[in-house]
Regions:
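Short glycine-rich anion-binding loops that position phosphate/pyrophosphate groups of nucleotides
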Residues: 14, 85-88
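Redox-cofactor binding/interface segments in oxidoreductases and associated redox assembly factors
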Residues: 82-83, 103
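Conserved active-site segments centered on acidic
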Residues: 1-71
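Residue-level signal for alpha-helical context at structural boundaries
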Residues: 38, 42, 70, 85, ...
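Generic detector of well-ordered secondary structure
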Residues: 26, 54, 83, 131-132
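Conserved acidic residues
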Residues: 78
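Phosphate-binding/catalytic loops
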Residues: 88-146
Length: 146
């Protein structure tokens, strides 16, 4: 039996969805498989790459991908989780199909302001919030699968 697939979606697939994908695959990749995509794929946020490297996860070689391309591939997902902020919720893409949809609002790292160090600190806070939510999801989901 194949592992249940999880798709994390945000606007650009440059930060939040990438972090969530990396954490899920790291924490419970033996039971679940995560991917991520965005409405308008961009380039990875270098500050996100930096803060993820701090916790031992290297995103530097990751590519961004479009939700539409994932949809066209015909893959089926058990869960589709949007990670856009509440302010962006209207522009956060939806993924059709027989999936369970969840919304985990997180602030957009590309919109944080301040000095480089202040931005890094704010992105670390977002990273930790995403990590906590993924850990909770993995614990709940893996219990249901066993």
């Amino acid at each position: 039996m194949s592992k249940p697939k999880i798709l994390f979606i945000c606007v650009h697939n440059s930060a939040r969805s990438q972090m969530a994908e990396a954490f899920l695959n790291d924490i419970c990749g033996a039971e679940l498989e995560a991917q991520s995509a965005g409405l308008e794929p961009g380039t990875l946020n270098p500050l996100v790459v930096e803060v993820m490297r701090e916790v031992g996860l290297d995103l530097s070689q990751n590519k961004t991908q479009a939700v539409f391309d994932v949809f066209k591939s015909g893959q089926l997902f058990t869960y589709v989780i949007t990670v856009c902020s509440e302010a962006e919720a209207g522009g956060c893409p939806i993924f059709p199909g027989p999936t369970q949809r969840l919304h985990w609002p997180f602030p957009d790292p590309s919109k944080v302001e301040g000095t480089r160090e202040e931005k890094l600190e704010k992105i670390r806070q977002i990273r930790e919030a995403i990590l906590a939510r993924v850990e909770q999801f993995c614990a709940e989901t893996c219990i249901r699968l066993s």
